[in-house]
Amino acid sequence: MTAKRGIGRHESLADKIQRHRGIILVISVPIVLIGLVLLLMPGRSISDSVVEEYSVHNRKGGPNSRGPKNYAVIFDAGSSGSRVHVYCFDQNLDLIPLGNELELFLQLKPGLSAYPTDPRQAANSLVSLLDKAEASVPRELRPKTHVRVGATAGLRTLGHDASENILQAVRELLRDRSMLKTEANAVTVLDGTQEGSYQWVTINYLLRNLGKPYSDTVGVVDLGGGSVQMAYAISEEDAASAPKPLEGEDSYVREMYLKGRKYFLYVHSYLHYGLLAARAEILKVSEDSENPCIVAGYDGMYKYGGKEFKAPASQSGASLDECRRITINALKVNDTLCTHMKCTFGGVWNGGRGGGQKNMFVASFFFDRAAEAGFVDPKQPVATVRPMDFEKAAKKACSMKLEEGKSTFPLVEEENLPYLCMDLVYQYTLLIDGFGLEPSQTITLVKKVKYGDQAVEAAWPLGSAIEAVSSP
């Protein structure tokens, strides 16, 4: 029989451990396991934290690229082709890169207006652009991402029924094929003031001018295929004195509230005076006879807006002076048509030509023809020129023969060579006689605008995207 411990006996440490060994085992096992887990985890030094913070704050999209994102998909259905732009914005309306670029931009030819009698084929021409654009938007965000199709002047020239049939086919394509969000007015023909004001917003947004006084913004001339738009900010006083537009015409002034400041934007769109449409207007002046704007050696037909126009060159070749004369005629540069104090051409009020017009950015076909004519670098997104540079290039183009065209102007597409004299003369005449610029005045030709360390296409769709993501 084992004797009991005496009540007064002193218990050693070994005896205590022996007596409580079960409890100690239960406590020690989890502690050991936790220690092993911590030991096996990778270490994180102070320098690691600094590197991660630096990379977040110095990536192209900035610190907000991890926050909420809004995408917008904008189709530009122009007269010379269809284009799609995909943009991504953070909560501050700053652009976030898509891959290595600040936008996804894709284009193809011909445009919707090339299918005036086949709406379904017109809509299907957008399928490849739509699929690639939608694939760039995260799947979970597609139902919240606005898609817009803005048809411009080329479709307007087809007439209401033909253009509406094409637009309806595009609506059905988006409904049946896309997860993107379409509103009731998502597919439409843009009116001239929309196109011009969106372009103005785009360029001034990229230049970070929005929020500044109107005189610190830049004016914009956008020469498309079917129409040309002029837009610039004017004073409240000039806006108040703006003449009322004729019946059926758009208002001369749009009020826009951007970045905390109200702007009064003069904007006008000249339908039939885009570069491709203007060719038809100039050919109409000479009717079916020889035209002094056509390069020597050409005798063909010019097709535009579903119509054909005879385009025979003069036997003596093109003439810059004679081409200028009939171009001024086509522009209707005639003071008797002007019922206002100041006009551009065709009896249109010019907006007063205040501070918002002192710096002019000129886009689209102005840049393209200047690059093809060789007096700006096509690889550079921006170039500073003077209107007289177009006249100088026109002299060269008007004096050549058609067979010399490819060697003289290697960057010009063959189908455009017969009309190169006409295009350059028209652009010079539009700037000088139409918009009243001085021949030696400095203007900025713009293809893309630098935004941070990226270059963004200087086109109206970005302005439309800003409006889309700002709407509820």
UniProtKB/Swiss-Prot annotation:
Reaction(s) catalysed by this chain's protein = a ribonucleoside 5'-triphosphate + 2 H2O = a ribonucleoside 5'-phosphate + 2 phosphate + 2 H(+)
Q: Does the keyword rRNA-binding apply?
A: no
Instruction: Quote the record's binding site residues for ATP.
Output: 73-83, 219-229
Q: What is the active site of this protein?
A: E195
Q: Which PROSITE patterns match?
A: GDA1_CD39_NTPASE (PS01238)
Q: What is the membrane topology here?
A: Single-pass type II membrane protein
The EC code for this enzyme is 3.6.1.5
Glycan-bearing residues: N334
Task: Give the keywords, sorted.
Answer: ATP-binding, Calcium, Glycoprotein, Golgi apparatus, Hydrolase, Membrane, Nucleotide-binding, Signal-anchor, Transmembrane, Transmembrane helix
Keyword Cell inner membrane applies? no
State the similarity comment.
Answer: Belongs to the GDA1/CD39 NTPase family.
Q: What is this protein called?
A: Apyrase 2
Q: What's the source species for this entry?
A: Arabidopsis thaliana
